[in-house]
Amino acid sequence: MQRRTRGASSLRLARCLTPANLIRGDNAGVPERRIFGGCLLPTPEGLLSAAVGALRQRSDDAQPAFLTCTDRSVRLAARQHNTVPESLIVDGLASDPHYEYIRHYASAATQALGEVELPGGQLSRAILTQYWKYLQTVVPSGLDVPEDPVGDCDPSLHVLLRPTLAPKLLARTPFKSGAVAAKYAATVAGLRDALHRIQQYMFFMRPADPSRPSTDTALRLNELLAYVSVLYRWASWMLWTTDKHVCHRLSPSNRRFLPLGGSPEAPAETFARHLDRGPSGTTGSMQCMALRAAVSDVLGHLTRLANLWQTGKRSGGTYGTVDTVVSTVEVLSIVHHHAQYIINATLTGYGVWATDSLNNEYLRAAVDSQERFCRTTAPLFPTMTAPSWARMELSIKAWFGAALAADLLRNGAPSLHYESILRLVASRRTTWSAGPPPDDMASGPGGHRAGGGTCREKIQRARRDNEPPPLPRPRLHSTPASTRRFRRRRADGAGPPLPDANDPVAEPPAAATQPATYYTHMGEVPPRLPARNVAGPDRRPPAATCPLLVRRASLGSLDRPRVWGPAPEGEPDQMEATYLTADDDDDDARRKATHAASARERHAPYEDDESIYETVSEDGGRVYEEIPWMRVYENVCVNTANAAPASPYIEAENPLYDWGGSALFSPPGRTGPPPPPLSPSPVLARHRANALTNDGPTNVAALSALLTKLKREGRRSR
């Protein structure tokens, strides 16, 4: 043990030694090479790679183990056209029996429910109060509706999350018969498991590359989104059945029930039409068999619940009515929460693979069905926006961010597929932020569309009117035109003024008229990049004729860091101070300053030159303005004509001794001309022959023995 420790210390000491052949002789070039070659300042490429690596690590930590395993990556790499075999999706479902795919969302939802605690009895009374408000808006007048109790609370958060997360139901016996109540509880438990399987299917069906289209994934998304529309039709029928039962209880003499929305379609007809003429049923593809089986399982549970609601006998009195209302809200909340998962997951990232991306007709129909259902049943069922949902779910948004960042770093520019989606989103956000929606997309009373034509005709008309013109693919190292358009709009004052968060002088514009909806429309402002190639003081236009943004750029406020508080008096301009000449009376210094100024004038941009931030028109021209390639780093040559020749020994990386693949202290082979003869040096007395030779391999054992002997002699001399 002592010998092993002594040997390890000797090796650590030998690792820090400098070879003797570098100590003797004239080696003037070695320090420069060690300084500039050993400089560890990060490069822009290294910083971008580190940022993408951090995104990837954060994403991998948030994913289930199966999504990041090697076996899945190998099987996806063997596929063509960015497809995912359904057998791989089924393996993902089998590998996640405890629903790890939704653990972040479940944790955040449980924490939110814990912060707003509400007992079961109080929650049931609050749900009943909300139901009375809803019933007064959908049935004709003359119905004796109970008055709202004083001091009621808002149960929206618990209605949205509790039925899906809590294992126990609020209304455990909504039917008179105990056997029927037990069948109801078993059906709800089976429905929860079936909904989880569809959500797992959607979670694990993502391809490896979000920057390319995927035919199989587009077909599966169409099936899922069409299935969402079917869910909301079933939910409307369930609520209509409950309303009819409650109205008969409140007014037994009036046997006619005429709701404002009319009688919905029976669930059996809706389900049969979807299974026969749905997206996966009409294409004949074999890559949606497991998805169709999972959808059929869910529809079977919903059919059993519909039969219980239609034929089951309810308890009489007030408690029977309360249990009927609460159980209906619970079941519909579970289905509504499941539909929100599919829609919000599509908006968070899966929409990149959908047919026509965000203009997908099934996505439009699903969102339209959800919004119509929420408006008709208000204030019973709240809706979670996609940003709020993504902050709770975490994993899907992190995965798409890391995957798209890696592709952008690898290719230098977004792909054609990804860029077309970004342009579509930017164009539609500009349209909606400028004013109210067009007539064919406006909503009439009750959530129905006011424009004429079918849903497909509306989607095609909106797509034809608002789709941007096709643009050529951008070249590498180019500047997006969206930023230039934003600056052009800010400089010219065209269009609605956008707020500037960093400008304390600008006044906030008046709020634009927003459509009446339950969804939060995020009016994001494109980020402003720092100004580059700013002209010198002699080439700036008069400040009075420049817009506000140009005046701020001329003052250098976009280049220097923001200083909080008043600026010190008499501080010179940063850009002008850069070009000040020396205050020396020496002719040589003045001549050098004049030469530097003339060189800058030769290389300075002229008024006629195109700037990389030059604005372009909206007539379908080039979106990207090419930036000339410039080298960031120049090779530094520090040797002068009279300097000593460079040493032929070049340092290389080695994981152990920093000396390449050769033996200990043995330099690499000579690649240049032979070195000049070294000056003779006195031969020093050596303790052991051939222990430290200048050329040839070194004996590690001899070196260890030498160091041990020197250590012992040092102790004796003390």
Swiss-Prot record:
Q: Which UniProt keywords apply?
A: Activator, Host cell membrane, Host cytoplasm, Host membrane, Host-virus interaction, Inhibition of host innate immune response by virus, Membrane, Phosphoprotein, Transcription, Transcription regulation, Viral immunoevasion, Virion, Virion tegument
Q: Record the organism.
A: Human herpesvirus 1 (strain 17)
Q: How is it modified after translation?
A: Phosphorylated by host LCK. The phosphorylation seems to be lymphocyte-specific.
> What is this protein's name?
Tegument protein UL46
Predominant location of this chain?
A: virion
**Topology relative to the membrane, per the entry?**
Peripheral membrane protein
Localization recorded for this chain is: Virion tegument; Host cytoplasm; Host cell membrane
Q: Which InterPro entries match?
A: Herpes_UL46 (IPR005051)
